[in-house]
Amino acid sequence: MAKYLAQIIVMGAQVVGRAFARALRQEFAASQAAAEARGQAGRQSAAASSFTGMTLQEAQQILNISTLTPEEIQKNYEHLFKVNDKAVGGSFYIQSKVVRAKERLDEELSINQQQQTKNKHADEQQQQT
């Protein structure tokens, strides 16, 4: 009786050990994929900053945006663009800064959307394994 009990315990420990090892490998693979995705997003964001000549923080300050939502960006852009129109005594320089800020934020939204799509596909592939 004790012999069978010991065998059951050993077999149970082996099953749990294998399951734990498999889960650990999957978690490690997922964390590596996430780290790679974050690294790529950082490179894309840096490229967008050099292309537009403006950092994400500068663009957010110019358009007075705290969260990146397309509606808020468009609303603030339209308001600031109209207010700074040269015909109503505004500044062309500031108006051009507003345009560049919107371009930079639109680029960041595009990068974020691409990352979400890639992450979604990676999650689907991971769930299939």
Curated annotation (Swiss-Prot):
Membrane topology (UniProt): Peripheral membrane protein
Region (Disordered): 110-129
Residue span of region J-like: 58-110
Annotated localization: Mitochondrion inner membrane
BP-aspect Gene Ontology terms: protein import into mitochondrial matrix
Record keywords: Membrane, Mitochondrion, Mitochondrion inner membrane, Protein transport, Translocation, Transport
GO CC annotation terms, alphabetical: TIM23 mitochondrial import inner membrane translocase complex
Primary role: Regulates ATP-dependent protein translocation into the mitochondrial matrix.
Subunit structure: Probable component of the PAM complex at least composed of a mitochondrial HSP70 protein, GRPE, TIMM44, TIMM16/PAM16 and TIMM14. Associates with the TIM23 complex.
Recorded domain comment: The J-like region, although related to the J domain does not have co-chaperone activity.
Protein name (database record): Mitochondrial import inner membrane translocase subunit tim16
Organism from which the protein derives: Danio rerio
Gene: pam16
